[in-house]
Amino acid sequence: MKTVFVNPERCIGCRQCEFACAVAHSRSHDAAIAPFETPRPRSRIHVGTGTTYNTSFPNKCRHCDPAPCVEVCPTSSMHRDRERAVVLADGHKCIACAMCAMVCPFDVITFHSAANGAPPRVVATKCDGCVERVSSGEIPACVEACKAGALVFGDLNELIAAGCARETSAMLTSATAALATREPDGVAGWRAWGASATHVNEEVRHGKP
């Protein structure tokens, strides 16, 4: 199963993924025209503030299985496409009850007027995995726009394995660096005592009491 994998440590907060997503879900699919369409196309990926200073995090639907939004939707607007392994929102069935948004653990479901042919009213909007692009052999718009490598498209198991290998390597590197610079217990105290003793010896040598 292919999916979009997020590397938050590589996100630079440029928000190019947001713009590319909005254009991909516009009527014109043209970056020069899409911003002026009515209703204005909206991004389904959102770059937010990270957990540490000066960091960003691209947040998008994880297409959970089972998906809480699918389980609570009273009209089956939220449904899973088993063939393509994505959770989709059918704007024609959506009644904007917001049950899906309330149970979404990642807070990625928003409500906007549909811009790509769905009913001209506010409906639930979320990432659809760029199913049309992927079906035609392209990669998701957000991944194509990301030049920092924060978004990667590929087989889920392979991406997880690569991510685990990267994290393990980082942990080993950090641990080695920490061990190389760590002093044995008590050394700091001995160094302080030595400095004091040297100071006293210098005073005695120069005839100071």
Label every model-predicted segment.
Residues 2-4, 57, 85, 123:
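Short amphipathic alpha-helical segments
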Residues 8, 75, 91:
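Aromatic-flanked redox-active Cys/Sec active sites in thiol-based oxidoreductases
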Residues 22-25, 74, 105:
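Protein kinase-like catalytic domain
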Residues 29-63, 71, 92-93, 99-209:
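Flanking helices and flexible, charged tails adjoining ferredoxin-like Fe-S electron-transfer domains
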Residues 63-81, 85-86:
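Ordered, amphipathic secondary-structure segments that act as subunit-interaction surfaces
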Residues 83-95:
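Active-site cradle of extracellular carbohydrate-active enzymes
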